[in-house]
Amino acid sequence: MEILRRSQDEDRTAGIYPVLDAAALQEMIREAREIYMHDRICRYIAELARASRENTWTELGLSPRGTVALTAMAKACACLKGREYVVPSDVEEVFPCVAAHRIILNMKAKVWHVKVEEVVRQILESTEKPALKTRR
């Protein structure tokens, strides 16, 4: 009871200050949207989405909206790393976070105690990564 009483009296937001304002956030979003994505990376994202829908363990995979979210997150990842372009590892890094809560496992997966994280890993491992040319 004492813990409940004390928690109601405390101001848990005291000492918390914003690290950026709305304008700064909008600027970051704009910068991320301008990140370049090669057609090969776009195809890779589309293949990951297709593989998520056709996987033996899934009832539902990435929808078109989920695919758009994956694209936006890959661009944001590249931007945060200081690059002006997306590489396959950006997609691989964000795919588990974007896909895990969108993939619905089928009954077979539930019976066999397959975890969505395993399916996400399987999709990443079985989908061919695009080869991008490096400048010499």
Predicted regions and their residues:
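Short hinge/gating elements
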Residues: G15, A23-I35, S52-E59, I103-K110
